[in-house]
Amino acid sequence: FDNLENCIHIVINAKTDKKTSYEDCNTRLSEIENLIHQKEPDEISKKYPDKSQFTSSFKKENFMKAVRKTKDYIANGDVMQVVLSQRLTKKFQGKPIDMYDALRDMNPSPYMYFLDMEDFQIIGSSPEILVKMEDDNITVRPIAGTRPRGITEAEDLQHEIDLLSDPKELAEHLMLIDLGRNDIGKISKIGSVELTERMIVERYSHVMHIVSNVKGTIIDRTKPLDVLRATFPAGTVSGAPKIRAMEIINELEPLKRGIYSGAIGYLSWTGDLDTALSIRTAVIKDDLIHVQAGAGIVYDSVPETEWEETMNKAMALLKASEKANEPKEDW
């Protein structure tokens, strides 16, 4: 598959000692082409899975109470934004690798990963760079501002218009752009930090997001782990200012976050670093699957809306887990 040209090249080797080689190759090419087109994308339900199938670390009323408490902290000047999350847990009887396959089909994302840690598995489809370092260049790509996908193209476009005209979402995103600039500014050469993409909309299977791109050139002798240390945790999953936001998260969230909002990536022998923010990520352990999702709380937040945002973000993983529980011949 050619990602640049967005096309597939099919190559068949012909045997030169057979008179029918040309016809055989054409037949095989047709067979492969038919296989490529055989599986149509699944129709993805936009409805929430049956709530009786999963439990939450936050009852809905408790989550909304935590949102109101966070807004009190914001009104008192403690903090500008806090990202509150809930963890959803349900039974999982399938194979973890089938969960990865289902997620790859239903919610393809820039970062796809399957980590088998023997007694548990981590499976994810993260849309967001935590931080990337290549040669002397570093990138952070804040994602903030969310709407569910529309059922029709017209509804989808209307959701995008609503998202880009929502003062609350825009203010939240601008705050996180500034935080990203500040994070990489600590390890970048003076004058090198720039905003290369500003407030574009990216679409995924169940949600769309506002996304921006911030780049800088690192100070000489800066190591990859210095870069990770300067940018972790991401403001998009903690808040601003970070330390006070994390204190409030520790107070209000009923469970420690674990892998959620951490980092998954690699450090190469050449010193390059590429890390995904571990959101849209599931942990499977002891026949249970755990999915966590958050929402950025600001002064204008509506508790019910923020709860719905966490559910929308968890949707792709919950639906993929349902598919992975089915016999694979039914896919």
Could you say what each language-model-derived stretch is?
Residues 1-331:
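Extended alpha-helical targeting/anchoring segments
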